[in-house]
Amino acid sequence: MKRYLILMLLLGLLLTGCRKQTQPEQLPTAETIDTQANTEPAAQTPEQTLTLGMIDFDSEKSVLRSMIQSYNFSGAPFRIEILNYADGAESRADAVTRMTTELLAGNVPELLDCSDLSGAQYAGYAKNGILLPLDGMPDAELLSGILKPCYVDGKLYSIVGAFALDPLFGPAEKLGASLETSVEDVLCGAVPNVSFFWGGEDLLSVYCRHAAEQYLDYDTQTASFESEKFLNILTACAAVSSAAPAPDSIMQQPMRSAAMYRSMQISWYQQTGGAFRVLALDSDGGTAYQPVLQLGVCVGSAMREAAEEALRNMLREDFQLTIADAFPVNRAALRELMQKEIEAQKAEQQTAIREEGRVEIGEAGDLAFLFDEAAADDLMNVLEHADCRSCGNQEILKIILDEADAFFKGRKTAQEAAQVMDRRAALFIAEAG
């Protein structure tokens, strides 16, 4: 009996063990996966940040900062934060030294503000592997002349997304359409009763601030001040004495936008009774500009592709239309902004007519200058031919004026002075690069 009870107990334990065996793991069905996906909260992708290195001394880059702020509010996938090398610096020279030291040490931001770099510095950064060659930029949609100084050895190393026009200009009735008349035409007396506001060395200084970059080749590290064109300019400047400005003088004034251009045309008309037109820097046309938004990508950044994408986004028409305090480079955006100025002109014109009790639709009283389609086309032609970056390199300007002074005072011939300019400028470019 005892043996029977023991056997029954063992049988019961065996059956219990069989019931407790682990069931095989079942793979989730597609329906189960969908259910889980709908019930679990989506993972949040952290916002990624790109750093933009710049030198902003005394808050001179407020327009650029405003553009970066607009970009950050545009819904772009990458936010841009500013690294100001001037923070804590006692002078601009200290800030430049700090930036150069950091870049050469490999401590680079994703993006670099290139608008302050001289042509020699820019070429040096490109040739020494600090700036990345840019591919896939929408060149066909942009003003081609603006990008010309951005190339080094045939490769694009930065983009200009916004700029200020930096023209020489004078009376339309004497100059014709913009860029029809050149600086040399005025200097040689081909335009009667029109002269420059400056004379002698001052005139040469103004000309070189606008046009000196045309005579510098950073690819070959050479200069061409001994060219016939520059020798003609140099000789003509020496013959122009400083005198009281004539009523029809050539003037200079940077213009940041179509709105500012229209405002200046109105002021010019109120003072002279006519419009102004832009003078070409040489017989081939062209005028000067100042970059406001000019950015490159640093080779040493781990986020190069994201930085390049940010630059492409800045060239898109939708972002370019948000630029208010500079000229955009996107042609479609430029045309649309000019059309807004045409409409604004019409609205102001109608207001003036109502206030003065007149009914003539075509008159604008003291508003005078009519910014219409023809005026917009003339301005667009100037912008299409803006291809010479203004020269802010004080060392280059000093070289030119030093040697020109020797010519003006009779110690050298024009050609001798130009030869020394070429040698000194080439040496400076080589050392700076």
Task: Show where each model-derived region lies.
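Conserved C-terminal helix/tail region of periplasmic/extracytoplasmic solute-binding proteins
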Residues: 348-433
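Extracytoplasmic "Venus flytrap"/periplasmic binding protein-like
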Residues: 77-142
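Periplasmic-binding protein-like
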Residues: 311-343
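C-terminal motif of bacterial Sec signal peptides marking the signal peptidase cleavage site
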Residues: 14-17
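Hinge/lid segment of periplasmic solute-binding proteins
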Residues: 115-167, 273-281
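Extracytoplasmic/periplasmic substrate-binding proteins
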Residues: 235-312
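Short, polar/charged alpha-helical segment
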Residues: 58-79
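Helix-loop-helix "hinge/cap" segment bordering the ligand-binding cleft or interdomain interface
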Residues: 135, 148-246, 297-303
